[in-house]
């Protein structure tokens, strides 16, 4: 029955309600359960995956949401927390070319899957741009590695991440990256619109615009032009299934077809969720 919350197994067990069974909800639920929480996920739709849906037409399956598998080390890290290697759960195929750019009123461009060939492409379009791309990607890699080591896996519950010697040594660069928008950062180095488009599109992944995105995120060019773009066989539904499997193995409960309309609270703390039919 919609709105019926499972009875906790123990009064001493901490509980958590996760709203939404997209990538973030599934991963959060699995991690909370791993920490000992009794977790229930509430999802308005009748399937998990959120925006990572798929449709079938004439026997062909199509991803309706994400279609690029980037930052493989982040996925590797997550799966390893639960004792899995990524290759045990997913069959990933490197894409070459990584993707195809369709500039307005110009011929399409195939973007190579490695930095050396990408530099050759840049040079063929704009003399001098090949060497500039190599420098750009070197900076992107350094920034990416710094973010991975000190920022990606921290809760920022203390300023410790900002006080690490490596981070302090890069304060000047970080200040520049945080105060210069991505479009201006790229425009200072490249003139051709197509090259700028290749390097500023990551702002889309942040639901932003290059003019409003800090150039810190030029680190994203490391993920597609250096690490390369991968695609999971079976589509992104396969990635959803892998994380969903882990969450269930951790004991997470799922309430599909259940819409949360409000979070109740008292004294500054969340106390429950209000469902579309009744209040739990």
Please report, for each region that a protein language model flagged, where it lies by residue.
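N-terminal glycine-rich phosphate/pyrophosphate-binding loop and immediately adjacent elements
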Residues: 13-146
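A short, basic/flexible loop-to-alpha-helix module at the beginning of a structural domain
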Residues: 3-14
